[in-house]
Amino acid sequence: MSQSTYSLEQLADFLKVEFQGNGATLLSGVEEIEEAKTAHITFLDNEKYAKHLKSSEAGAIIISRTQFQKYRDLNKNFLITSESPSLVFQKCLELFITPVDSGFPGIHPTAVIHPTAIIEDHVCIEPYAVVCQHAHVGSACHIGSGSVIGAYSTVGQHSYIHPRVVIRERVSIGKRVIIQPGAVIGSCGFGYVTSAFGQHKHLKHLGKVIIEDDVEIGANTTIDRGRFKHSVVREGSKIDNLVQIAHQVEVGQHSMIVAQAGIAGSTKIGNHVIIGGQAGITGHICIADHVIMMAQTGVTKSITSPGIYGGAPARPYQEIHRQVAKVRNLPRLEERIAALEKLVQKLEALSEQH
């Protein structure tokens, strides 16, 4: 489909979903639900935005089957999906908004590639990128402008390294990995020994960083190499911008780490863990599978059971909820205590009179 305008019926067929409404409605763009006009397609995923459904002018709204049962009586054009509405909307995004490339196909003449480096077929290396000795760049990879692939490092097939990424020596990047601008993979860890005279001596870090397949790493995120063992991010994990992962940390499969979180050295994060923004995790501990940490959680010891945690130090969400409720009740509790104190004073005065 290469045209710029589609009917509702055409889109339903392309997306392989059902529709309700006027199949001849023409759609030519995408927009948020509260701002969409008659030519726009939008979606409802988060129920917080359901309040905009009735007033939305969108030409079509992508919703789940469960949502459709709730809102089917509204006089709207609906595209009804069994999967996440956001995933279906993504297909529309890619249909209406054409991605833009850098305009530098192939290997640019200003790229510096060591003669011992191995560059496989169909690789794009943009201006002023550097590929060091014995590095290996897999087929169909994209290396952005000014990026560095360090000595003896490997980049797996179909990986996309954006501009100004630094991948240091002896780093292993898996297949289909995406690394956003400014990320640094494989810096020396923050390891020092303090002498008897109070001087801090840096310890060389000679371990590796291993990034497995289908990992995504956000802008300006840093992942340090181990001192003698490896720092590892397992398959399918997603890391936001400005995240610090220290030496010899292991992040399990399909975990998510949100912006400005920090993980200290030698900590092991389980599979399917979600770490909220600005969370801080101390070193040398373990986090169980299926743990969710709320934003700004401070973790000082291992978490052994799945669940939702928050606060500093980290506690189960139910406990935090009870504590918050008690704090909210403090003003009333203070009034009750003051009233009881007055009553006690009156009783004491009566007792003294008798």
UniProtKB/Swiss-Prot annotation:
Protein name: UDP-3-O-acylglucosamine N-acyltransferase
Pathway, per record: Bacterial outer membrane biogenesis; LPS lipid A biosynthesis
Keyword set, alphabetical order: Acyltransferase, Lipid A biosynthesis, Lipid biosynthesis, Lipid metabolism, Repeat, Transferase
Any one GO CC term of the record: membrane
Subunit structure, interactors included: Homotrimer.
GO biological process: lipid A biosynthetic process
Function of the molecule: Catalyzes the N-acylation of UDP-3-O-acylglucosamine using 3-hydroxyacyl-ACP as the acyl donor. Is involved in the biosynthesis of lipid A, a phosphorylated glycolipid that anchors the lipopolysaccharide to the outer membrane of the cell.
InterPro entries referenced in this protein's UniProt entry, alphabetically: Hexapep (IPR001451), LpxD (IPR007691), Trimer_LpxA-like_sf (IPR011004), UDP_GlcNAc_AcTrfase_non-rep (IPR020573)
Enzyme Commission code: 2.3.1.191
